[in-house]
């Protein structure tokens, strides 16, 4: 029974569909901060990871932000999302662009989520596979929830 439920949840992900940047962010945010509705104020990894996307200082630096501070991630969701976008445009421009245009693939979301979790080469690291499975499950859940919504 559990196998059938898992297959039912993941089935929509196997069909050719376009994905959006918002869908990717929503799934990543949920994996990063779980049941916390907005992720604002969430501090993780002994104070090193801040806000809805659990952004570390080196990630913030790599995003090459020209305003704000790393601490701004803690209380500003839009700022945090801008950091993620800049980081992904730097390390995975094609995938990010397709997602921003609403024509992303599941592979695009896999790549950016694994980079988010494991750094610029995160998509090649075995250690980021479990993270990707969590993002993929959340993506499936979100898609199924939107289909069932009135």
Where in this protein do the model-derived segments appear?
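Sec-dependent N-terminal signal peptides
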Residues: 3-12
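Catalytic glycan-binding domains that act on GlcNAc-containing polysaccharides
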Residues: 16-150
